[in-house]
Amino acid sequence: LITANIYVLCSDGDLQEGVSAESAALAGHLGLGNLIAIYDSNQITIAGDARLAMSENVGQRFEAYGWHVQHCNGHDHDQIVQAVEAARAEGGKPSLIIAKTTIGKGSPNKQGTSDIHGSPLGDEELAATREALGWEHSERFYVPEEVREVFANRKAENIEEYEHWQELFSQWQSAHPEKAKIWNQHWEPPYGEDQL
């Protein structure tokens, strides 16, 4: 019933934090094979170039924690899919996919710099980026109809999968009432909303 993978998207800045070492070491120790972290390795943080404060080999660090580590081009969807499939097949240990990217790819004057991290492009750079990427739409926050259709179809598939899972879960609860009681206790807060 509970066969889901847990996905993490993390950045250079995230992996500089001490808590990443503690949690990654524990995940490796416990062999959390359904945990897949995709590391957007663009060597940029909000404060500037990540190499100003980070020089370790992240892949080797995670291998030392007992993780399955892969590298891919973060701009190549096929490579990402292959890496995720390999991570799911690994099963016995958590996986780190180091996806090498260029932050702001396509922005002629800001890509690869911290100027694009958490900051708007501005009208001129936005126009230059649209041109560089061959994006013919000038509307802000525009989503083409074919993209909307893809998401609408996926939403329908997700609803169908969820309803099927709910049926299986209901059958499991009926067959295992004591375990179901424990399960439900974990999803109920130990206090009421009025106590928050």
Model region roles, listed by residue range:
Residues 1-153:
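Glycine-rich ThDP/TPP pyrophosphate-binding loop and its adjacent helix/strand module
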Residues 1-5, 71, 148-196:
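Thiamine diphosphate
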